[in-house]
């Protein structure tokens, strides 16, 4: 279970949100909505243990995220709103390198198959600088097929995706939740999921 208790995020002297509480159980998705600058990315970084909350507590399986550290990171897959890809490397090279850094090495043939599922057949060996924004987003999201983690935290994963890719991602998230995973997602767009979905809106 992922739990936020009385969370607050500050930007300078301004409070983005305060006294925010929620629980996400196994098989559930927390869908976070809000305008630009409302604190969605700040919230996700708190939940991922990357930045501490200005106030409040984040717990994973009953323990504070800041205390778990490496144990928590082994169960987390965080995709920020930036792709994190190296422009000069191919899609395959980026994902192979990322899997090594995550201590879950995978063969290039497995990566190629994941990229095919992401709709990138024929573009796997191109430098990512030659790919469109939507294709770069698909490369980044293909990590979901390669790294087996219980908790997915996805910041604006639908950005630049076409309708087909949005459906693919929704099916991927549903499959993850059916297998006992959890997900936290931010987006300006709606996302049709068959699984149990909790929606919160911040910055209002």
What is each residue range found by the language model?
Residues 88, 127-134:
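Conserved ABC ATPase signature
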Residues 96, 108-123:
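Conserved ABC ATPase "signature" region
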Residues 53-72:
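Conserved ABC transporter NBD signature motif
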Residues 48:
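Helix-to-loop junction immediately C-terminal to a conserved catalytic motif
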Residues 152-156:
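Catalytic Walker B motif of ABC-type/P-loop ATPase nucleotide-binding domains
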Residues 141, 180:
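Hydrophobic anchor residue at the start of the ABC signature
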Residues 82, 87-103:
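Q-loop/switch helix immediately C-terminal to the Walker
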């Amino acid at each position: 279970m992922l739990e936020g208790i009385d969370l607050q995020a500050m930007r300078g002297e301004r409070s983005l949100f305060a006294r925010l509480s929620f629980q996400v159980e196994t098989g559930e998705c927390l869908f976070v909505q809000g305008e630009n600058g409302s604190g969605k990315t700040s919230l996700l970084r708190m939940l991922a243990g990357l930045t501490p909350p200005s106030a409040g507590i984040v717990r994973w399986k009953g323990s504070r995220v800041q205390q778990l550290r490496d144990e928590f990171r082994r169960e987390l897959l965080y995709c920020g709103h930036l792709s994190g890809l190296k422009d000069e490397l191919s899609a395959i090279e980026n994902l192979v390198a990322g899997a090594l850094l995550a201590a879950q090495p995978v063969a290039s043939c497995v990566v190629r198959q994941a990229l095919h599922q992401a709709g990138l057949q024929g573009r796997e060996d191109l430098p990512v600088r030659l790919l469109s924004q939507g294709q770069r987003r698909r490369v980044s999201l293909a990590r979901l097929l390669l790294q087996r983690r219980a908790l997915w935290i996805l910041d604006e994963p639908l950005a630049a995706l076409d309708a087909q890719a949005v459906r693919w991602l929704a099916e991927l998230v549903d499959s993850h939740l059916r297998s006992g995973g959890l997900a936290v997602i931010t987006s300006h767009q709606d996302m049709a999921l068959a699984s149990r979905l909790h929606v919160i809106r911040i910055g209002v």
